[in-house]
Amino acid sequence: MKEQAYIPQPLDTSAIVLPKDLDVLTEQLAQNVHAVWAAGRVADGWTYGEVRDDVRKTHPCLVPYDQLPESEKEYDRRTSIETLKCILAQGFTILKQ
């Protein structure tokens, strides 16, 4: 059987604008995205290292979120923002109780 190349088709969320009242949630989700990623790495035997080394299993981003470089925080924020936009695009409402 011939394998077909995977062609990603993410939901188009370009028209979705997140309300400002979701800014705090966006940052909290970004922090959690990092924590989940880091926990997975640590569980697999990775530790902090100044440079990423796949053989030694070291990674410079195995630090608390507030110690990440801004570029890494922005990566996690983009993941959070796209997740929230996808939820809204599907017709859900996000309400804090």
Pin down the residues of each PLM region.
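Alpha-helical propensity feature that highlights long, continuous alpha-helices across diverse contexts
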Residues: 1-97
